[in-house]
Regions:
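Sequence/structural segment immediately N-terminal to covalent heme-attachment motifs in c-type
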Residues: 28-48, 109-110, 114-137, 152
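Bacterial N-terminal signal peptides
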Residues: 12-25
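N-terminal secretory signal peptides that target proteins for export/translocation
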Residues: 1-11
Length: 198
């Protein structure tokens, strides 16, 4: 478990770095790779996050990223770091970032499969709750539906709990509705299985 003081200090440092980049004029960067640098400071090199509860972005669908960036910019989805990071972005900026993020490599799945029973339960739950209908059969997402395969397990748990608790804002209510009847034990198994998919 991460020391709460260290977690708070790390969060403040990340906020400071992102705010520094967000307040600088767009002319500071020569390329999209340069402009993505502050994003990857938190979301990880090549979009593969190593920070607890911070999602990996690699191979995320461009329409989904565009919608999320828009929600952050308009403060329809509230998370201070992200709201500040994109507040000055134009619609073209949002599209450019969404396209660039979608071209990052997919994160490798978690390889620790020490609990085969949880894998079996998780796979059955994916079918039972039809996650593979919207998120695609391989959970790689499509169109405005996000890639969840290989995503950080802790982020998946956090996100599903937020949808279940009607805390997570979205552009429609479908995930909140889907998550309502799912008990926490099933959320843990769903996340365990999904994080280990390529």
């Amino acid at each position: 478990m991460v020391n709460p003081g260290i977690r708070a200090a790390t969060r403040r440092l990340r906020v400071a770095v992102i705010l520094l980049y967000a307040w600088m004029p767009h002319a500071w960067a020569d390329s999209i790779d340069d402009r993505l640098a502050p994003c990857l400071a938190c979301h990880g090199e090549k979009g593969q996050s190593n920070i607890p509860e911070v999602p990996s972005l690699g191979a995320q669908t461009s329409p989904y990223v565009l919608i999320q960036l828009y929600l952050f910019r308009e403060k329809l989805r509230r998370f201070e770091i992200m709201n500040e990071a994109v507040k000055g972005f134009t619609d073209d900026d949002l599209r450019t970032f969404a396209d660039a993020i979608s071209k990052l490599p997919a994160p490798p799945p978690t390889t620790d499969t020490t609990d085969p029973a949880r894998m079996v339960r998780g796979q059955a739950l994916v079918r039972q709750h039809r996650c593979n209908v919207c998120h695609s059969p391989d959970l790689a997402g499509r169109d405005a539906v996000p890639r969840i395969a290989g995503q950080r397990e802790d982020f998946l748990v956090k996100t599903m709990r937020e949808y279940k608790g009607n805390i997570r804002a979205g552009y429609d209510a479908s995930m909140g509705d889907v998550m309502q009847p799912i008990p926490d034990a099933d959320i843990l198994d769903l996340a365990y299985f999904t994080a280990r998919q390529p």
